[in-house]
């Protein structure tokens, strides 16, 4: 065998003969600047991407990727262009000022003279001004801001300018507006005799004849030293007038002293401040002669001379006789309603509706303070004799009341003794005719004509005059005259406003005992009105006439025959078909009591 060859030793030997293998290392050096003199610039390295241009800066993943190759080239081009800041081109220079000439300051004398002439010229208005007709003159004119006054207080001040006596409530706004516009001179003592009151559309125009709504103020107010002078409406400054009156008298109420409803009541009552009881009663009688003659849930009744004074506490924060006291705004409506019904008693030759059925309101006063000892004495004497169902009248100093001063109408039907059937018929025909007249004049509904709200008295008169929609008629009285009172629940349309009491706020009124005639009548009223008490539903008057017939049949004793009772029952049956008192007054039951037939 041949000699074996050691391959590994040969390999090692050959490597030793060839020498060491050269090592490859990276060498870093500065890049040579391109030759600026060269006109051609090689951009090939940009496209190849072997290196990143230093002018581009670090890679921006957010927006650099969206740039096109062309766009990148344009950026590179700008990097090697002369990027030195360029000088701004010189603008046109102003010519130098010639030597020896002085530049004058601007002269606006002509302009000043022009505007001075304009300012001195009074320019008459060529279009209506929103404030008042005047001239525009140089300078700023400041229109004084009038303080906020209630409508009623404003009109009270206007009436004070026109007349030194107090007038009626301005709730019926047209009354005072019409009066103030037409009067430029001082009126006589019969204040507001020229006022008129609108009536519902169905009433004829003649029914808006002149009426005296509210009497003049009492002697104390009339005697006040308030200057009266001729004055035109446009020259009245309400703010100055209020300040002047405030300085001459401490009797004028302010908004700080009373709430607005009390101020409205003062205006409606013709007062500048509340009275105390002695002041109010002294006008009608000696205070020592005051006697209590009756009471009700909401107040007390006292006799003062030939008048009856009904006192109703208002706006207190505690209950009286178990009931919440009435609010001033509720009494305000009753005050206006009372004055409105007074018009039906006025004997005017042009009156379209007239009747003496509603009690005459002689005066209404707003009082404040506790009961006077004289009144407490009268109250306790009544309590000892009759046993009062009301609370003892212990009231605080700031308690307010409305005192209605009414004509003495006699005794109520509950206590009055009817002698015979003719007197009973007279009662029914007077009540029916009275409701019919008020329906025609004011869409009136009493809504609470129970036997305590009808007063009867005897007199020597055989007949009473009535006018219904212009037709005159005389009613036989047989010596008995009735007066309807208490308009608390009543509804009336004054021509300016509908006054009513929302009975939905008194659900207990309709929860009286079953079988009781008065309670049943309330429930029948509710069914007729469907709880819409503002609406006109003359049928409610008929319901109370039916109630009166029931009272005569079941509660009152008088001389009568079975024939008379049959006539009353027949009348009740026919009344079930009537929708108003105007229809009922034409019933055959009343035909022989009307000297002139109403049709």
From Swiss-Prot:
Disruption of the gene: reported phenotype: Embryonic lethality when homozygous.
The keyword Oxidoreductase appears for this protein: no
Tissue localization of expression: Expressed in meristems and primordia of root tips, lateral roots, shoot apex, leaves and flowers.
Entry keyword annotation includes ATP-binding: yes
Protein's GO biological process: mitotic cell cycle
A molecular-function term among this protein's GO annotations: ATP binding
Active-site residues per Swiss-Prot or TrEMBL entry: 448
Induction: Expression peaks at mitosis.
Gene Ontology CC annotations of this record: chromosome; cytoplasm; cytoskeleton; nucleus; perinuclear region of cytoplasm; phragmoplast
Subcellular location field: Cytoplasm; Cytoplasm, Perinuclear region; Nucleus; Chromosome
EC number: 2.7.11.1
Binding site for ATP: 293-301, 310, 407-412, 448-453, 486-488
Residues annotated as domain Protein kinase: 287-599
Enzyme class of the recorded protein, top EC level: transferase
Record's catalysed reaction(s): L-seryl-[protein] + ATP = O-phospho-L-seryl-[protein] + ADP + H(+); L-threonyl-[protein] + ATP = O-phospho-L-threonyl-[protein] + ADP + H(+)
Matches recorded under Pfam families: Haspin_kinase
Key words, A-Z: ATP-binding, Cell cycle, Chromosome, Cytoplasm, Cytoskeleton, Kinase, Nucleotide-binding, Nucleus, Serine/threonine-protein kinase, Transferase
Protein purpose: Threonine-protein kinase that phosphorylates histone H3 in vitro at 'Thr-3' (H3T3ph) and 'Thr-11' (H3T11ph), but not at 'Ser-10' (H3S10ph) or 'Ser-28' (H3S28ph). Plays a role in mitotic cell division during plant growth. Threonine-protein kinase that phosphorylates histone H3 in vitro at 'Thr-3' (H3T3ph), but not at 'Thr-11' (H3T11ph), 'Ser-10' (H3S10ph) or 'Ser-28' (H3S28ph). Involved in histone H3 phosphorylation in mitotic cells. Contributes to organ and plant development, as well as embryonic patterning.
Family that this chain belongs to: Belongs to the protein kinase superfamily. Ser/Thr protein kinase family. Haspin subfamily.
Remarks, miscellaneous: Over-expression of an inactive kinase mutant decreases the size of the root meristem and delays root growth.
Protein name: Serine/threonine-protein kinase haspin homolog
Organism: Arabidopsis thaliana
Organism placement in taxonomy: Eukaryota, Viridiplantae, Streptophyta, Embryophyta, Tracheophyta
């Amino acid at each position: 065998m041949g000699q074996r060859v050691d391959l590994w030793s040969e390999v090692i030997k050959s490597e030793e003969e060839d020498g060491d293998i050269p090592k490859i290392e990276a060498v870093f050096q500065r890049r040579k600047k391109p030759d600026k003199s060269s006109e051609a610039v090689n951009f090939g390295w940009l496209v190849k991407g072997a290196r990143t241009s230093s002018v581009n800066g670090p890679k921006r993943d957010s927006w650099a990727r969206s740039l096109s190759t062309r766009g990148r080239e344009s950026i590179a081009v700008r990097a090697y262009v002369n990027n030195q800041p360029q000088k701004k081109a010189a603008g046109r220079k102003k010519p130098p000022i010639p030597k020896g000439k002085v530049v004058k300051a601007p002269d606006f004398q002509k302009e000043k003279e022009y505007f001075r002439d304009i300012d001195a010229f009074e320019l008459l208005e060529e279009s209506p001004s929103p404030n008042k007709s005047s001239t525009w003159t140089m300078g700023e004119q400041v229109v004084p801001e009038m303080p906020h006054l209630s409508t009623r207080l404003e009109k009270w001040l206007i009436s004070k300018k026109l007349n030194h006596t107090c007038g009626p409530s301005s709730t019926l706004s047209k009354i005072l507006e019409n009066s103030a516009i037409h009067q430029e001179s001082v009126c006589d003592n019969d204040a507001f005799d020229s006022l008129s009151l609108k009536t519902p559309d169905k009433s004829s125009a003649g029914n808006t004849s002149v009426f005296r709504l509210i009497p003049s103020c009492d002697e104390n107010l009339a005697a006040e030293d308030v200057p009266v002078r001729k004055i035109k409406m446009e020259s009245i400054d309400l703010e100055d007038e209020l300040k002047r009156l405030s300085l001459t008298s401490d009797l004028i109420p302010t908004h700080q002293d009373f709430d607005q409803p009390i101020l409205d009541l003062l205006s409606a009552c013709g007062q500048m401040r509340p009275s105390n009881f002695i002041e109010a009663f002294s006008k009608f009688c000696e205070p020592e002669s005051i006697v209590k003659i009756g009471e009700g849930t909401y107040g007390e009744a006292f006799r003062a001379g030939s008048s009856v004074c009904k006192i109703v506490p208002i706006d207190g924060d505690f209950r009286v006789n178990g009931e919440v006291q009435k609010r001033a705004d509720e009494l305000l409506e009753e005050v206006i309603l009372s004055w409105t019904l007074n018009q039906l008693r006025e004997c005017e030759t042009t009156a379209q509706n007239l009747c003496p059925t509603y009690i005459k309101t002689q005066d209404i006063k707003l009082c404040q303070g506790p009961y006077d000892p004289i009144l407490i004495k009268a109250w306790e004497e009544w309590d000892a004799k009759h046993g009062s169902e009301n609370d003892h009248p212990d009231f605080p100093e700031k308690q307010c009341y409305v005192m209605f001063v009414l004509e003495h109408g006699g005794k109520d039907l509950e206590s009055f003794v009817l002698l015979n059937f003719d007197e009973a018929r007279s009662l029914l025909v007077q009540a029916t005719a009275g409701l019919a007249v008020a329906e025609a004049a004011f869409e009136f509904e009493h809504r609470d004509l129970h036997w305590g709200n009808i007063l009867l008295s005897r007199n020597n008169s055989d007949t009473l005059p009535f006018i219904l929609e212009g037709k005159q008629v005389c009613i036989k009285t047989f010596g008995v005259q009735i007066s309807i009172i208490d308009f608390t629940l009543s509804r009336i349309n004054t021509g300016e406003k509908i006054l009513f009491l929302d009975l939905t706020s008194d659900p207990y009124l309709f929860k009286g005992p079953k079988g009781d005639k008065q309670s049943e009548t309330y429930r029948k009223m509710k069914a007729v009105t469907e709880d819409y008490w503002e609406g006109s539903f003359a049928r409610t008057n008929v319901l109370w006439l039916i109630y009166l017939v029931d009272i005569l049949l079941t509660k009152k004793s008088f001389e009568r025959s079975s024939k008379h009772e049959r006539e009353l029952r027949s009348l009740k049956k026919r009344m079930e078909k009537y929708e108003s008192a105007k229809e009922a007054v034409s019933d055959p039951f009343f035909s022989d009591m009307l000297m002139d037939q109403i049709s």
